[in-house]
Amino acid sequence: MPTVNQLIRKPRQANVKRNKVPALQENPQKRGVCTRVYTTTPKKPNSALRKVAKIRLTNGFEVIGYIPGEGHNLQEHSVVMIRGGRVKDLPGVRYHIIRGVLDTQGVKNRKQRRSKYGAKRPK
């Protein structure tokens, strides 16, 4: 434990919290345009072809966003909305594309957790 004199010489430093989603600039969502839509493979224990898109945001940031759900209609120049939230087994993917908003269609034939995938209530 430091002495009073030591604390006067060098005060305690506040713990600096690093922002996990800097491209959002404290906003809940941001709009952007897809510059490239492709698949990538996850880290070691997992195996799949995960669908991701490189997105140029309205604030000039270029980020990689994950496309959740089965099947999608995204291509280059699609306008999308992103939210924060990383994908644990894809390095560098710190954002999710919101389904059912702007050019992104909702997931077809989705019965449960529909709001997360932009699916309308089945008749």
Curated annotation (Swiss-Prot):
SUPFAM superfamilies referenced in this protein's UniProt entry, alphabetically: Nucleic acid-binding proteins
Keywords: Methylation, Ribonucleoprotein, Ribosomal protein, RNA-binding, rRNA-binding, tRNA-binding
Keyword RNA-binding: yes
Homology family: Belongs to the universal ribosomal protein uS12 family.
GO molecular function, one term: rRNA binding
GO (cellular component) term, any one: small ribosomal subunit
Name this protein carries in UniProt: Small ribosomal subunit protein uS12
Keyword Kinase: no
